[in-house]
Structures are given as C-alpha cells and as structure tokens.
Swiss-Prot record:
Annotated compartments: Cytoplasm
Stated name of the protein: Phytochrome 1
GO cellular component, one term: cytoplasm
Segments forming domain GAF: 216-395
Family that this chain belongs to: Belongs to the phytochrome family.
Alphabetical list of CDD domains matching this protein: HATPase_Phy-like (cd16932), HisKA (cd00082), PAS (cd00130)
Natural source organism: Physcomitrium patens (Spreading-leaved earth moss)
Amino acid sequence: MSTPKKTYSSTSSAKSKAHSVRVAQTTADAALQAVFEKSGDSGDSFDYSKSVSKSTAESLPSGAVTAYLQRMQRGGLTQSFGCMIAVEGTGFRVIAYSENAPEILDLVPQAVPSVGEMDTLRIGTDVRTLFTASSVASLEKAAEAQEMSLLNPITVNCRRSGKQLYAIAHRIDIGIVIDFEAVKTDDHLVSAAGALQSHKLAAKAITRLQALPGGDIGLLCDTVVEEVRELTGYDRVMAYRFHEDEHGEVVAEIRRADLEPYLGLHYPGTDIPQASRFLFMKNKVRIIADCSAPPVKVIQDPTLRQPVSLAGSTLRSPHGCHAQYMGNMGSIASLVMAVIINDNEEDSHGSVQRGRKLWGLVVCHHTSPRTVPFPLRSACGFLMQVFGLQLNMEVELAAQLREKHILRTQTLLCDMLLRDAPIGIVSQIPNIMDLVKCDGAALYYGKRFWLLGTTPTESQIKDIAEWLLEYHKDSTGLSTDSLADANYPAAHLLGDAVCGMAAAKITAKDFLFWFRSHTAKEIKWGGAKHDPGEKDDGRKMHPRSSFKAFLEVVKRRSLPWEDVEMDAIHSLQLILRGSFQDIDDSDTKTMIHARLNDLKLHDMDELSVVANEMVRLIETATAPILAVDSNGMINGWNAKIAQVTGLPVSEAMGRSLVKDLVTDESVAVVERLLYLALRGEEEQNVEIKLKTFGTQTEKGVVILIVNACSSRDVSENVVGVCFVGQDVTGQKMFMDKFTRIQGDYKTIVQNPHPLIPPIFGADEFGYCFEWNPAMEGLTGWKKDEVVGKLLVGEIFGMQMMCCRMKSQDAMTKFMIALNTAMDGQSTDKFTFSFFDREGKYVDVLLSTNKRTNADGVITGVFCFLQIASSELQQALKVQRATEKVAVAKLKELAYIRQEIKNPLCGITFTRQLLEDTDLSDDQQQFLDTSAVCEQQLQKVLNDMDLESIEDGYLELDTAEFEMGTVMNAVISQGMTTSREKGLQIFRETPREINTMRLLGDQIRLQQVLSDFLLNTVRFTPSPEGWVKIKVVPTRKRLGGSVHVVHLEFRVSHPGAGLPEELVLEMYDRGKGMTQEGLGLNMCRKLVRLMNGDVHYVREAMQCYFVVNVELPMAQRDDASSQM
C-alpha cells in the first residue's frame, strides 16, 4: 500500500522505501497463498482477480507470514526428473533423500535387500558407497571446495549399474544437498566437472551480446531472449522486468507463431511472490520439467528439527498455486533465470554500499514436458551474468542521462525565477508542467488559482490545500500515488483523472501542485485482443486475469513519483520560498557557508602543494612520462623517457610526437589518442611504440603501455595531453617469444628473471597446470599449492579462495576472458584485481592467449599479468587527487553560481517596486546604476562557455545605450573597495559623455572597465592613494550620417602597479593562472571581440590601463546629432 511522503528525499530513502514495499508485498503474498490453500481444502473455486485485490489490503499475523516463508523454502517435495540426497557436511552420512532416489540410482529396493548387500539407501547410509571410486573422489573434492557451485556439474557413475549422472551439489545449514539427474545420450555432455566447461556452450551468445551497441536496453533484452531460445528450444522465451512498486512487465518476447503474445503484459507483484524472488537470488536458474507430474516426497532423519531446506535445489517442486497458473496458460514446462544487477545505495553516513538486486527474470515456457540438461542450464545462467553486466552499464548510462536531466531542470528553474515569480512559472512557457512528468499542475497563491492541464476544480484544490494545512501542517509538502490511500476524504470525487499528487508548500498558506491520472492510462498490452464473443474467466489464474488483477490494484493509483522528480520539485520549492524572504537574511548566509564547509574542499594553497608534488613526481619518476601541447608538440619529457629512448630532454622539446618520435605502426593509434584526449576523452592501457636514438638505437623500439590524460587550464579547457606510461619492452619481447615457441616453453616460464611477467595457465577443463615463479611472488601461493585446482572456483573466486576477488562482476569478467581465449580469441590488457595470500589488494593488467597442441587444437589458456610500477601508481594517485580537487572546486563554483541567482532575483524585484514610486532625478540615477549592475552580474553568472570567449567567437549583443550610465555603473563597483582602503576615485570625462548614445554591448563594456578599475584599486597603495579613470572620445564620420566614436579609457594609479606575473597572465604568457589573472585575461579577450585593444603601461610615477574601443553612434532624428 502506498503511503504519503511528508518530506522529499533522494537516494538515501530509496532503500528503506523499497524495503517497506517488499515487506508489504510479502504479507500480501502470504494472504493470497492462504486463500488459495483454504479454497482447495473446502472445494471452493479460487477467484484469482478478487483475491489479489483483497490480499493487498489484508494484514496477517507475523507468525502466519513466517510459516508461509518456511513452506516456500522447506516444502518437503521434489520433482520426479531427478532425485535428491542430503548428507552431513563431514562423513557423507545421509540425513534426507527423495523417495525416488533408489530408482534413479539403480539401487536394490529397500524392502527386500540381499544378505550383505551394500547398495541400499536409508537414513545414515554413507552415500559414497553408492558410487564408483573416481566418482567418490570427485564428490569429496567438491565437498572441500569453498565455492562448490563452480564445480557443478560433477559427473558420477553408480557403483552397481555404471549409470552416469550429473551431481549438482550445494551447501545448506546442516550439510550438503546433492541433486542427481540422469545423463542422456543426446545431452550436451561435458567431459569434466566445473562451470568453465558448461559455459563454453554459451560462447556464441555471449559474443553477440557483447557486440551490441550501448544505450538500447530494448535491443539488449530482445537479443537475450533470442539467444536463450536458440540454446534451449523452448516454445516461448520472455524477459520480465520488475518495477519499483514490485509489479512486473514483459519487456521482450520470442515465441512459437501459434502462441498468444504476452509482450507488454503488466502483472501484480503477487504473481511472483517475494519469497520466490528471494529464492531466485540464491538459486539463479530454476527448472520445472512437468508441472502436471506428481511431486516426490522427501524422507528425512526424524531427529532433524525442521524440514530440509530446498531453497538451492534444482529439483524443488513447484507450489500448487504456481503449477495451476502454468496449467491455465497452457504451459507444462518452464525454465526461469534470474537477472541480477548491482544495487548502489547510500547508507545513513552517506557512503555508498554496493549490493545486488533482482532486476527481473528471463522465463522460458513449453507446451509439453521438457528437461534441459544441467550443463546447458549452467551456460544459460552464465549468459544471465553477462546480461547483468551489460545491464549495469546501461543503468550507469541512464544515471548519467539522469544527471543531465537534473542539470537541465536546474537551468529551467533558474529561467523560471528570472520572470515574475511566482506567477511566471505557470503563466509562461516553459512552465512547471515541464519540470516533471504530470497530467496537470496548479499554483494556489494568495487565494487565487492558476491551473494547467488536467487538474481538480478550483474549489477542490482549495479543499486539498485546507486538508494539507490541517492534517499535514508540520510538513513542507506531500507526495503520493494515491490520494485515497493518503486518506484524503474527497478522493473519490476526483475520479480517475486525478489519483496521484505532489504538493509543495511555498508560503505558510500557498502551494504548488502536480497531478497524475491513474496508472492504467499509461499501460499498453501488446497481447492479442479478445474476440467480442469470448468471455474471460477472471477467477482463473492466467496472464490475462493477472493483467486484470493488476489493473484492479492500480485503478485508483498513478505512476509513483521518482526521486529525481521530487528533488526537482523540492529545489523549486526552496528557491520560491527563499524569494519571499529578505535577501539579507543571515540564516541564508549561514546555510551557504555551512554547505561550503560540508564540501570539505581544499584551499588554493593545498591545491598548489598537490600540483608541486605532481610536478616533482613526474620529473623524478622511474615511469616514462611525456606531454604534448594542443598541436601535438612535446612540452614535457621526463628523465625516464629520455633514458629509455636515448633522446635528451633538450632535443625532445618542441618535436612532433606523431611525425618524429613514434614508429609508423603506432601513428594511427597515437593520433586517435590525441584526438580523443584533446576532446576530454581519456583512453587507458594503450600500447604505443617509440623510436630510439643515440646509444639506444641498437636495442630497437620502446614499447609503452600508456594512459592518456587531458591537461586542462584553470578554466577546464583542454590545452594538451600527458602520457603516463609503463615500459613493457622486455616483457613484450618475452611474451612474443613465448607464444611463438612450438616445443618446450619451461625455460622461459620458469625463468626467475625479473623481466619474466607473472604467468599462469589452465587446461581445457579449467584446471591450473602452470604457475610460474613471478606468479608465486605476486600472490604468495606456491605452484604445488595451486596446480591441479580449478582456476575459477578453487584458485580465484568470491569466498575464501587462494586469490579472493572483490566482486561478482569482476569474477564474471574474468570468466568471460577465459571463455573468450578458449574460443580462440585473445584478450589484451584486461583490468584484473584480487587479494593475495596476505590480504593485500593486487591490481594488474591481464592478457589471455589460447594454448594449442601440435595440431593446432585448443587445449587451454595462458594468462599473462602486467604490474604497474610503484612510481606510476603514485603518479596516478596524485593525478586522481588533483582531478578530485578540480571537481570539488567546480561543485563549489556551481553551487555559488546557483545561490547568487536567488538573492539577485530579490534585488531585481525590490528595484522594480521602487521604480513604481515617485523618485527624484538622483534617486532615479541610483536605480539605473543598480539595474545595469544587476544585468552585468546576470551576464557573468550565465557565462558557462568561456571557451567561446577565448576562441573569439562569442556573439556580442548590440543595443543602444547611454555612455553616462556605463560610467556610473563602473565607478559604483569600485567605491566600496576604495573606501575600505581610504582611496579616492577621480572621474575625468567630457560633459558630452554623459548623454552620448552608442550602439554596442553595454554590459560587456561595463564588465571589462569595472574589472580593470577594481584591479587598479586593489594594487594601489593606501592610505592617501588615488585612482583616476579618464575617457577621451573622438568622433569620426564614416560617410553620410553614420558616425563612430573612438573611446580611449585610461585607468591610472600611483605606486609599483600590478604584479608583473599578473600582467603576463592577462597576455596568456604567465606560468599559471590566478583568479585575478583569469579575469583580466577574459576581459582582454572581450575587448578584442569589440575590435579594441588593452595595454598596461608602467611609468616612473604611475601605471595605467589603456583601453581603446570604437563604437557606432546611435542614429538620432534631432539636429543635435548632426556634425
């Protein structure tokens, strides 16, 4: 059930909200199951649609819910296509088995055992006595493994008959459960235990999946269902996606032509209970061979306290409710695979916790009994892992798009506030309906109404506002997908047109509203339409009755309000509420400073220290580092790169990287690196080859693995590229020689020479056969401790393996790389990380190559590791720290830019109020000066694209203005600082300047003159100092009545003047760029855009800026304008 949210939150509340939804859904699941079981006992029919609606409103005692969950996991029944035996964790003593186990295992019936017969199965039997010696060895090895699932399936043979079976083992709380399935002659037989062998079956599907372009989840889902159907042969394969409210949707489907389509079907959350979803997280591939077959009872040790858990068993029997559902839709067999992705949530401390969540399911249905062998099911499960990886990337891409949406929304909010707030946000375009997806919106302000789209009537909105003030008076707003569930008394009067609402309080009695219609309006089902003569039986469990039940559940409910939408609404609310406060409110200032402190930004001194440390590291690093400017010319060449190439620093500087220094085969690679890096796209782990010079020439080329880093100035403009490299020449030579050797490779692999990289290998069955000395040194594990173990599952894995990996995604990527090599395709420089024997985190690059025999047949895989030097790691660490500081500074700038706009709106509003009063001439002049200063501030705040100023293609405004107004505004901006320093500002301008009307960009002219004036004031000695601004106009006739005015502005002051470095920064010749230097630099470029120029002159007694611009005079009809 939906509950209203009284305050707005973002991702920090998502986890608790999702938990609440799941708890409520579990209760509904239990209630629905209770109704089903009760109807079966009494003989009454089970009305599915009505029961679903009723279950969502019922509450059950916690004991009843717990009992329901226990039955789901410990039902005591299995399917008949295999058998189950549970044994103790040590000793293999049988504690439970399915009744059909003797038959499946070809044992003598228990009722008439022969004298001395060992092949009997009962509680207490040692299960090892039932299988051959080699089978027992395999089972014992699996029992010792930490990650047992990666060893499945284990091929075993019955001792008596020799019958071959797949054993699928997993651990439970009291021991080990082993499922046995017969190996059929037409099965995809794997010749050894382990997941790696099974995964080969999905190689083609994985290759196709990885080749898909990004940004299209629909195409990804369509491809997955196609590949799964080709692998398994089921009549129908669908991809289900779970929505935030736990209901599901069919987003992709491939089916037999005569079957009814279900694409687009939405179904209530109870169709796949929470308990089942939990089981899918544990057992990710679930098969039902024949839902009509009678289940098999499990016999267990009577001393056990509760039924054996079958949560992870491949044979767990379907519950009656689900079996009936399948039968009603004409499906006899099914295969369901979990699609699991990362789930990043912020905890209460603000740190990100990475978990896993069920995104959806890939479901296969068949109209007749069907059993898919375990190796193929395992391959499908691995395909789902790859699918989950692809989905993770798509989700991250969607998150980036969401970030862009937030930025666009913030721009929209600022645009709204430049108007007549708050009326402008509903009376102009765009308006508040463009802020979030809705069917209607309203502003209730000062007992007046502004309505947009589909909304309640004015009287109904007033009633909602009064209800909010009475029942939610302590909240800043309310959002709900159901006004009825939020207990609004008159919700029934609003109809289907208004179900969901988000309300934001902007004053003590005024509100903004957004409204949404019922969800059913948004739902479209692509299924076949009913014949008018047919009647649905909504009482039966069937996809159509599920759809009907879903529509019944959501008929008075809208789509939920997403967190990003509530953040946008909350932002607008805060800004609007702030616009009704005094702009000098000290609380606002306190809030701004507190926010800045929370960002924990480094100051400029700390940034300088980091930068200096970075330079020192680059110059002294034993890693080769080089840098180029935007034209590709060398402007950085450290001692290490000079050493390995034989080219001294003095000879390298100024040479072209592409034309002079890289080999011909690397030209295209380096050109691409430069092109991308100069656009801000940084590539990593790219191999390039450099020429050698002098004494190094005889050694041949230098091979580097480089990371390309964009070099930026303080304005975040890319001005060059830095390459941080690792010299792998020696390792590459050995690797090339190694892969060319046809016979004995031991002399290379086992050579302890430091240039030999860490190397390990696995045979075609996934067992480690090579682990060289460098690998021993890197991991801490000796060769004799790992050889013979499964590479994935015993050496590398998620649990207490020899080399534990950090995440499931990392292990999946490793397995993909191994499978790719087994398929004959090498993987080069793949990022690979694990924990060594001492628990130290190791971060390396992995390259894989196929291993072949003399006939060219692939017999395994070789893996080579490349380790980054400590100097390179430190240099990259400092680089990341510098980038982090830069990002933090940008966040601070963006925040300040946003917060300045709010009080600026208040200033504008106050000035507009004053303009409507009776003012003297002096007062009117003050207001005019204030107005143009506001315009200047607004212009600067909107300067998001400094690059256009630097490159000289910024479009200047052209409008008529009065020069006297400009001078008043310029001088007013310098008055506060000059008074603080005890300086006087003298203004020397001809009288005609005050009334001279010109054409041009008034605000930009005002901006540059005020910047030059303020810098002059800052560097004038005080007290008793002075600053003088002088204007000399010269009129010119261009022909006819067209005149231009050449204006020379001279801003002078006594003393030593501006620091020389600051003046150099103005001319782009400084070593760095300070904030003051950046301002002067931008102003000089703005002057040049006006076809003017600026100089700074030093004389014996004074220094001064000289600014020359030429502007056309405005055409006047009166005679005074004529020469």
